[in-house]
Amino acid sequence: MLIDSSLELADNATLPTSGTLTNNLVIGGSIDLRGTIGIGDNATVDLSAGEPLYLVIEVTTIPAGSLATYNFTAFTHTASVDAGDAAAGTELFRTGLIAKALLPAGKRFIVSLPEADYARYLMVAGAANATGGGVIDTGNINAFITKDVTNWTGTADRVPATDPTT
């Protein structure tokens, strides 16, 4: 999978240890969708150049703690929001409550980003045990935007398992 480093929202970033369904905390920080090209918040800019863009959230370290569920969201906002702060702006995507047992290392959430009025910044946020009562002690994710969501897995000899010569 090709990953553009300027479209990386979280690189093995630690999950926030609190938050609720109405107070999601940013994971990894915000990325500037407009960069230094001076476009501003122009909703007519096609960020994907006519092709679908995908948000990929990948669990790298299994969440641990007394939490029962976790919730991931994506937001767009006119201002940058730092990691650990409450997410703000327009919600683009929500996973809904996910049981901790369903978040093993390597689990990926892949969603086609909607056509929307994107503000300048994009962020991924999360909330530990959004139903209340639990906390998260550890847990990490990668999150990025890509056009290539092929779920390719390398092998030790770099030869696909379907190659008849192996």
Question: What annotation goes with each model-predicted range?
Answer:
Residues M1-T166:
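Surface-exposed, low-hydrophobicity beta-strand/loop segments enriched in small/polar/acidic residues
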